[in-house]
């Protein structure tokens, strides 16, 4: 397919930061078998506050049974009970519940609002993990502005959107976690929900919709970071996986970063 040369230019720089070259890459527009993404937005907490802005329904995820419904605008404190969840004045005797907005209104968890559904799960450690399930492209609109400035050239933001989309699908395929695909912090990639969205970053996501990086007919492990310090590591040294595009090397692009040069003093007895 034909790609705008400016996108390729900035994509090269994004990949350079990760130690990649463009040889043997294919950028394809594809539709994933499942385009729903599950993001852990809070992990292992004791309580949380939930507020739907519009009509909503709460389901028992395990049985599919409707547990409650409301008009929205109420703030509920959620905590653990002996037999499940205490949701405001309600007791839900299940270890998994799902909150579904009826009119695409966002749902607040704490002070952040999110598109899609919100699930609450009781973990083995008797804590609450909260998961936001939403469409891939909507998820990316909450990721890209947290990983690149919306003031950067649009083609650079579009390159970042392609890399973030590729990384998302690669990590999802690994099935690392039992009931979610990624976290919302730097353990995966930073996700700020609907409240983080910006016009230019959302535009970049929309204009690159479905574009994914492949290497040797496989989704590329598109690892990336804010700054490499001037030198990227061979991916085989980090994850034991040999992948020529991620072999690492010097990165002139990051030389202007304040993190490009650093020093650490170590005592002999250490």
What is the predicted role of each segment?
Residues 3-270:
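Conserved, single-site charged/polar hotspot
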